[in-house]
Amino acid sequence: MSLEEKEFKHISVLLQETIDSLNIKPDGIYVDGTLGGGGHAYEVLKRLSPKGRYIGIDQDEDAIAAAGKRLSEFSDQVTIVRSNYCNMKQVLKDLGIDKVDGILLDLGVSSYQLDTPERGFSYRENAPLDMRMDNRNSLTARDIVNEYSEQEIYRIIRDYGEDKFAKNIAKHIVRMRSEKPLETTDELTEAIKAAIPMKIRMNTGHPAKKTFQAIRIELNHELEVLTNTLEDMIDLLKEDGRLSIITFHSLEDRIVKAAFRKNENPCVCPPNFPVCVCNRKPKGIHITKKPILPSEQELEYNKRSKSAKLRVFEKHE
């Protein structure tokens, strides 16, 4: 299947909810930090006037190519940049943009990445262990699995996969690689399966899911990038501008929720102080105290939306 066909079949999660959450101004400037195939971008662009601008950022070469084709009818308004969204501030500075009306992040791995076996993201298809979102980087999942210490692998699976069998999985990975390096997704999956009791494997989801997630997060620095970039993104918003973020697991959601709460209520004074003396000012409002979840209808036609959560922050100074 070609890249175009795969991207055509990709379904953007929480599409209408995300578009609504951005409160789009027709003449506004919007930034997509995880452009992907351009599904969300297309819907935003349809709502912009000829004066509106859209900047799409993605580190994945295939995503850049697919989005460029999908958004070609808006070429006068769209700027696509191959980069990580952690560089958003610099990307906008290079374009002469100081503030924007809205920012969107759709985190995690894309359907295209999962459905392209040779990318090595999926435990359902045998392929070389890769998992790089940006193939310009030299480090791959194979390097992590074969070169990290047992303690490091345990830490990754425990912290980023939240798997209670993390210690045993790390032990089995190291044991199997001592016989021969683990080269493929199937070989890694076999090591994981061997570490988890059959009774547990029969009654839960795929045993490799959490470990694959953990290795991918470690390799691509996903949580580190998110944590270190949230403040910059809020600062880039104009008054009334909105930051909308779709997360797919609790680790991401906790980081976003904490950052939004902190920027809504930044005061660190003890509760018994009569007045604030820390002088930390709120930057806006976390307008989704409870995250927006996929509808029953969306869950039916897009199973991958099951764990998605949308949170929105509105800038006020």
UniProtKB/Swiss-Prot annotation:
Reaction(s) catalysed by this chain's protein: cytidine(1402) in 16S rRNA + S-adenosyl-L-methionine = N(4)-methylcytidine(1402) in 16S rRNA + S-adenosyl-L-homocysteine + H(+)
Disulfide bridge partners, by residue number: none
Biological process (GO), any one: rRNA base methylation
EC number(s) per entry: 2.1.1.199
Location in or out of the cell: Cytoplasm
Sequence positions that bind S-adenosyl-L-methionine: 38-40, 58, 85, 106, 113
Major localization listed first in the record, in broad terms: cytoplasm
Pfam families registered for this protein in UniProt: Methyltransf_5
Gene Ontology terms for molecular function: rRNA (cytosine-N4-)-methyltransferase activity
Enzyme class of the recorded protein, top EC level: transferase
Keywords: Cytoplasm, Methyltransferase, rRNA processing, S-adenosyl-L-methionine, Transferase
Highest taxon of the lineage: Bacteria
Record-level GO cellular component terms: cytoplasm
Family statement drawn from the similarity comment of this UniProt entry: Belongs to the methyltransferase superfamily. RsmH family.
Role played: Specifically methylates the N4 position of cytidine in position 1402 (C1402) of 16S rRNA.
Protein name in the entry: Ribosomal RNA small subunit methyltransferase H 2
Native source organism of the sequence: Lachnoclostridium phytofermentans (strain ATCC 700394 / DSM 18823 / ISDg)
Source lineage: Bacteria, Bacillati, Bacillota, Clostridia, Lachnospirales
